[in-house]
Amino acid sequence: MAGAAAFVEADNAEEIMARIETKSQKIESLLKHYKHVEALKTALDGSPPKTLDERCKSANWIVVHRAIMAIKDIEGMLNSLTAEYYDILMKYLYRGLSTGDEPTCEQCLMIHEKLTERAGLGCILRCLSDTTNTV
């Protein structure tokens, strides 16, 4: 498979899972201190999009989902994020919408609306057209 070298090998999946667990603990601490935006930034940082291991993707989604669901002030959150976070956040919003869970979909749609206003349609197009870096 051409380009497979860019993806993380399966034996590195345990290393990725350990990093996700560490990140999860940090996010829980931030959420307990009502630092929701910092928790979201931490969740989005180092997301493992270049792995084919679904366990890693699912574990990271759980961490990002926890941070997304804690966001109450969407405008404030978007003001605190830099543009580099927009595309990866959009990917996770679509992952959230695919769950079919009503509270998750509701939160993801609210963030999606504000993020699209801020980042434009290009953010959606980049997210949907990037089939290599999936979450």
Swiss-Prot record:
GO terms for molecular function: actin binding. Its main location: cytoplasm. One of its GO terms (biological process) is Arp2/3 complex-mediated actin nucleation. The keyword Cytoplasm applies. InterPro entries: ARPC5, ARPC5_sf. It comes from the Eukaryota. It is found in: Cytoplasm, Cytoskeleton; Cell projection. Keywords: Actin-binding, Cell projection, Cytoplasm, Cytoskeleton. GO terms for cellular component: Arp2/3 protein complex; cell projection; cytoplasm. Pfam families: P16-Arc. Belongs to the ARPC5 family. Component of the Arp2/3 complex composed of ARP2, ARP3, ARPC1/p41-ARC, ARPC2/p34-ARC, ARPC3/p21-ARC, ARPC4/p20-ARC and ARPC5/p16-ARC. Functions as a component of the Arp2/3 complex which is involved in regulation of actin polymerization and together with an activating nucleation-promoting factor (NPF) mediates the formation of branched actin networks. Arp2/3 complex plays a critical role in the control of cell morphogenesis via the modulation of cell polarity development. This is Actin-related protein 2/3 complex subunit 5B. It comes from Arabidopsis thaliana (Mouse-ear cress). The gene is ARPC5B.
